[in-house]
C-alpha cells in the first residue's frame, strides 16, 4: 500500500491505499468525504490536482493527455503507484 495525502478544504487527510483500490473508494471506507458523481472516471466531479507522486488513471475517460500531464486526477478512477499528495475539490478550477 502507498501513503495518500489529500489536501482538502477541511485540512490534510492521510491514509494508506492499496495499489488496487481507487483513492476515492479508500477515502470513503475511512469516512473521508470527497466529491464524486459518476464513479466511472467519465465526469469531473471528483477532480483533483496531483502535487507529487505517480498514479494509474488508465480507467478514466474524461481527462485528455494534456490535462493528465498538467497533474489533473479523477480520484474515482486513480490507483496509487507511489506515495501521493493530491489537492481535492478542484472541479471548478478544471472546468472553469
UniProtKB/Swiss-Prot annotation:
A Pfam family: Fer2
Gene3D superfamilies associated with the record: 3.10.20.30
Localization, UniProt: Plastid, Chloroplast
Organism superkingdom: Eukaryota
Mutagenesis or variant effect for residue 96 to A: In 33% of the molecules
InterPro entries linked: 2Fe-2S_ferredoxin-like_sf, 2Fe-2S_ferredoxin-type, 2Fe2S_fd_BS, Beta-grasp_dom_sf, Fd_pln
A biological-process GO annotation: electron transport chain
Alphabetical keyword list: 2Fe-2S, Chloroplast, Electron transport, Iron, Iron-sulfur, Metal-binding, Plastid, Transport
Binding site for [2Fe-2S] cluster: 38, 43, 46, 76
CDD domains membership: fer2 (cd00207)
NCBIfam families xrefs: fdx_plant (TIGR02008)
Function (record text): Ferredoxins are iron-sulfur proteins that transfer electrons in a wide variety of metabolic reactions.
Protein name stated in the entry: Ferredoxin
Organism name: Leucaena leucocephala (White popinac)
Amino acid at each position: 500500500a502507498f501513503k495518500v495525502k489529500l489536501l482538502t478544504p477541511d485540512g490534510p487527510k492521510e491514509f494508506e491505499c492499496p495499489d488496487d483500490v481507487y483513492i476515492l473508494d479508500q477515502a470513503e471506507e475511512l469516512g473521508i468525504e470527497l466529491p464524486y458523481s459518476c464513479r466511472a472516471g467519465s465526469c469531473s466531479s471528483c477532480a483533483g490536482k496531483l502535487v507529487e507522486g505517480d498514479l494509474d488513471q488508465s480507467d478514466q475517460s474524461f481527462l485528455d493527455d494534456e490535462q493528465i500531464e498538467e497533474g489533473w486526477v479523477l480520484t474515482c478512477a486513480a490507483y496509487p503507484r507511489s506515495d501521493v499528495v493530491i489537492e481535492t475539490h478542484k472541479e471548478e478550477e478544471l472546468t472553469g
